[in-house]
């Protein structure tokens, strides 16, 4: 499941980068996402440049919207992620960050570093709940955006059950 999660996040991020710059979506990206069902990648009715938390989260106070991007950059830096030239709260950047967190999770699992593994999963869940989910729940309706919304929601559930399971296993071993 984990390797698939990293690939889906990375692919979605690439798709939004290509859409941001009005470039064709690479065939390999289309093929990965279309494995989940037929997806219409046409987002002409949506301004891809506006797919940002500080723009779309309607109940965000103006004072927070003004510092939101720097908060995001600080969060990224804590995990060694450098935001691209796009706004730090743009969906392409947030999806790329999740991909990097999942890749780190894979590495920690391979090294059998259980304590760090729990922490990185908790960080993923925190990021989804605090940043990515509020963004995707405010996305306009379009097939690709609906897919992103559903994927993020299901990933949050997966992470939560994984974290609860690990916590219970740790309690059983004490």
Swiss-Prot record:
Q: Does the keyword Chaperone apply?
A: yes
User: Record's Gene3D superfamilies?
Assistant: TorD-like
Q: Kindly name one Pfam family recorded for this protein.
A: Nitrate_red_del
Q: Name one GO cellular component term.
A: cytoplasm
- Lineage, please? Archaea, Methanobacteriati, Methanobacteriota, Archaeoglobi, Archaeoglobales
Q: Which gene encodes it?
A: ttrD
Disulphide bridges, residue numbers: none
The name under which this protein is listed is Tat proofreading chaperone TtrD
Q: Give the matching InterPro entries.
A: DMSO/NO3_reduct_chaperone, TorD-like_sf
The function of this protein is:
Binds specifically to the Tat signal peptide of the TtrA subunit of the tetrathionate reductase.
Q: Which proteins does it associate with, and in what oligomeric form?
A: Monomer.
Query: From what superkingdom does this record's organism come?
Result: Archaea
Q: Where in the cell is it found?
A: Cytoplasm
Task: Just give the chief location class.
Answer: cytoplasm
What UniProt keywords apply to this chain's record, in alphabetical order?
Chaperone, Cytoplasm
Q: Would you identify the family this protein belongs to, as annotated?
A: Belongs to the TorD/DmsD family.
């Amino acid at each position: 499941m984990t390797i698939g999660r990293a690939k889906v996040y990375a692919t979605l991020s690439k798709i939004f980068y290509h859409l941001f710059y009005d470039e064709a979506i690479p065939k390999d990206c289309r093929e990965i996402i279309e494995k989940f069902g037929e997806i219409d990648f046409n987002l002409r009715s949506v301004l891809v440049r506006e797919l940002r938390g500080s723009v779309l989260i309607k109940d965000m106070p103006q004072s927070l919207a003004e510092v939101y991007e720097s908060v995001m950059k600080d969060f990224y830096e804590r995990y060694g992620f450098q935001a691209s030239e796009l706004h730090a709260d743009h969906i392409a950047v947030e999806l790329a960050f999740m991909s990097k967190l999942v890749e780190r999770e894979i590495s920690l699992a391979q090294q059998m570093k259980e304590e760090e593994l729990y922490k990185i999963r908790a960080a993923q869940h925190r990021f989804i709940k605090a940043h990515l989910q509020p963004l995707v729940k405010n996305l306009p309706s379009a097939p690709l955006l609906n897919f992103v919304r559903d994927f993020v929601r299901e990933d949050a559930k997966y992470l939560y059950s994984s974290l609860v399971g690990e916590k219970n296993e740790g309690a059983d071993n004490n």
